[in-house]
Curated annotation (Swiss-Prot):
Domain of life, source organism: Bacteria
Keyword Nucleotidyltransferase in record: no
Residues forming coiled coils: none
Protein name: ATP synthase subunit alpha
Catalytic activity: ATP + H2O + 4 H(+)(in) = ADP + phosphate + 5 H(+)(out)
Principal localisation: membrane
Xref: NCBIfam families: atpA, PRK13343.1
Compartments where located: Cell inner membrane
Topology with respect to the bilayer: Peripheral membrane protein
UniProt subunit comment: F-type ATPases have 2 components, CF(1) - the catalytic core - and CF(0) - the membrane proton channel. CF(1) has five subunits: alpha(3), beta(3), gamma(1), delta(1), epsilon(1). CF(0) has three main subunits: a(1), b(2) and c(9-12). The alpha and beta chains form an alternating ring which encloses part of the gamma chain. CF(1) is attached to CF(0) by a central stalk formed by the gamma and epsilon chains, while a peripheral stalk is formed by the delta and b chains.
Keywords carried by this UniProt record: ATP synthesis, ATP-binding, Cell inner membrane, Cell membrane, CF(1), Hydrogen ion transport, Ion transport, Membrane, Nucleotide-binding, Translocase, Transport
Family, per entry: Belongs to the ATPase alpha/beta chains family.
Source organism of the structure: Rhizobium etli (strain ATCC 51251 / DSM 11541 / JCM 21823 / NBRC 15573 / CFN 42)
Purpose: Produces ATP from ADP in the presence of a proton gradient across the membrane. The alpha chain is a regulatory subunit.
Length: 509
């Protein structure tokens, strides 16, 4: 048989040329032990911290503990179907989520998968969940107002775009209600405001009941606010890693708007539950516990998350991400570990009290303990003009009210101060789902600090406010427009507003 070398080499070359590239090299390891949502894996020598790994059946996990002989992996899902000896595959990707405007109006889990039954999300961009916060140079100091629509907050504890303002209080004091009202208040700007002022909303529900999240979504949908909102839900029945990851996923989605010259508002509801799930993961991974059994890096967990809320400078597109983290206290104890941590990280706190809530002062904001470290730079001039005096008067009222309980014979000046304070406190009450535009708040507070309420019985203040708003919307719309466009109360506007108030006060019975 005649073998020709040239023919053989031609055949071999042909075979090599058409050789399929189906062979795929992937680094695999084996499960040594699994339980409580944690798997110990042997053999993933080159895995990165925070990398996604894949178990049989498509279940995903994240490598957190990189030890000399094994890797501690937290599992995003049920660990029931994973058993000892299973192969674990590296994906080569750090945990990321879809981002972009395609997510608006949707409810997703902590990995960005839709859970609202409205079909897939066709997002083209993805972003890592845990990225470094912007440095000092790309930032700009907070100077634009982020209006919540609540008089007590916008006048006394103003929040600016790019600020982190903590909402803290016991259970059932209206913390989520403040977030919800802030979201609903953005509707007017979205419907007919300039593109550059629109504020996109992101709500992260951590460890909440599903019914609570469903109710939140329902209210947003009914009031037309879901179209500019993204909901990330890691409910109480979800595994701890999902609850730990959800705030970071939500932050990545909010950062898309910040980095593209837009504005976003994110509410984390709440970070106490995220800390608890992180503690659970850390203890199961055998990391050493610290105070209240939390791991040593629980401060870093929250600081690296909240530092990502920022106001960018003009070179970076002037976008912003405003954060409203929520912390639940036990018995008004703000000196516990997690509350003190988050208070020290944020730029101020809105402190809600059970006693005020049951007295009917809602939103139940304790104005004495609440503070905004950005202050009046996050207010328009018109609001500064009226809110400056209300702060002082309420502070004096709180001081006097404590002493007034003991003595009955009060001089006229003290009596006047107490009367004014009681009426201003009444004026700051506001029913849920009824946020006010800034110009309407300015007009109402102007009436309060200029003595228009002093002659009224306290019980009539709410009725007077409703009547005044209706009157201004119909008869005095030019005054409201002037306050909105000029962003200040000029002498001319002040004269017109005073005349309108005089006219309304005469007719009010």
């Amino acid at each position: 048989m005649d073998i020709r070398a040239a023919e053989i080499s031609a055949i071999l070359k042909d075979q090599i040329k058409n050789f399929g590239k189906e062979a795929e090299v992937s680094e695999v390891g084996q499960v040594l032990s699994v339980g409580d949502g944690i798997a110990r894996v042997y053999g993933l020598d080159n895995v990165q911290a925070g990398e996604m790994v894949e178990f049989p059946g498509g279940i995903r996990g994240m490598a957190l503990n990189l030890e000399s002989d094994n890797v501690g992996v937290v599992i995003f899902g049920s660990d029931r179907d994973i058993k000892e000896g299973d192969t674990v595959k590296r994906t080569g990707a750090i945990v990321d989520v879809p981002v972009g405007p395609e997510l608006l109006g949707r409810v997703v889990d902590a990995l960005g998968n839709p859970i609202d039954g409205k079909g897939p999300i066709n997002a083209t961009r993805r972003s890592r969940v845990d990225v470094k916060a912007p440095g000092i140079i790309p930032r700009k100091s907070v100077h634009e107002p982020m209006s919540t629509g609540l008089k007590a907050i916008d006048a006394l504890i103003p929040v600016g775009r790019g600020q982190r303002e903590l909402v803290i209080g016991d259970r059932q004091t209206g913390k989520t209600a403040i977030l919800l009202d802030a979201f609903l208040n953005q509707k007017a700007i979205h419907d007919n405001g300039p593109e550059g002022e629109k504020l996109y909303c992101v709500y992260v529900a951590v460890g909440q009941k599903r019914s609570t999240v469903a109710q939140f979504v329902k209210v947003l949908e009914e009031r037309g606010a879901l179209k500019y909102s993204i909901i990330i839900a890691a409910t109480a029945s979800d595994p701890a890693p999902m609850q730990f990851l959800a705030p970071f996923a939500g932050c990545a989605m909010g950062e898309y708007f910040r980095d593209n010259g837009m504005h976003a508002l994110i509410g984390y509801d709440d970070l106490s539950k995220q800390a608890v799930s992180y503690r659970q993961m850390s203890l199961l991974l055998r990391r050493p516990p610290g105070r209240e059994a939390y791991p040593g890096d629980v401060f870093y967990l929250h600081s690296r998350l909240l530092e990502r809320a920022a106001k960018m400078n003009d070179d970076k597109g002037a976008g912003s991400l405003t954060a409203l983290p929520v912390i639940e206290t036990q018995g008004n104890d703000v000196s516990a570990f997690i509350p003190t941590n988050v208070i020290s990280i944020t730029d101020g706190q809105i402190f809600l009290e059970t006693d005020l809530f049951y007295q009917g002062i809602r939103p139940a904001v304790n104005v004495g303990l609440s503070v905004s470290r950005v202050g009046s730079s996050a207010q328009i001039k018109a609001m500064k003009q009226v809110a400056g005096s209300i702060k002082g008067e309420l502070a004096q009222y709180r001081e006097m009210a404590a002493f007034a309980q003991f003595g009955s014979d009060l001089d006229a000046a003290t009596q006047r101060l107490l009367n004014r304070g009681a009426r201003l406190t009444e004026l700051l009450k506001q029913p849920q789902f009824s946020p006010l535009k800034t110009e309407e708040q300015v007009a109402v507070i102007f009436a309060g600090v200029n003595g228009y309420l002093d002659k009224l019985p306290v019980a009539q203040v709410g009725k007077f406010e409703q009547g005044l708003l209706s009157y201004l919307r119909s008869e005095g719309s030019a005054i409201l427009d002037a306050i909105r466009t000029e962003k200040a109360i000029s002498d001319d506007t002040k004269g017109k507003l005073t005349a309108a108030l005089d006219s309304f006060a005469k007719s009010f019975q």
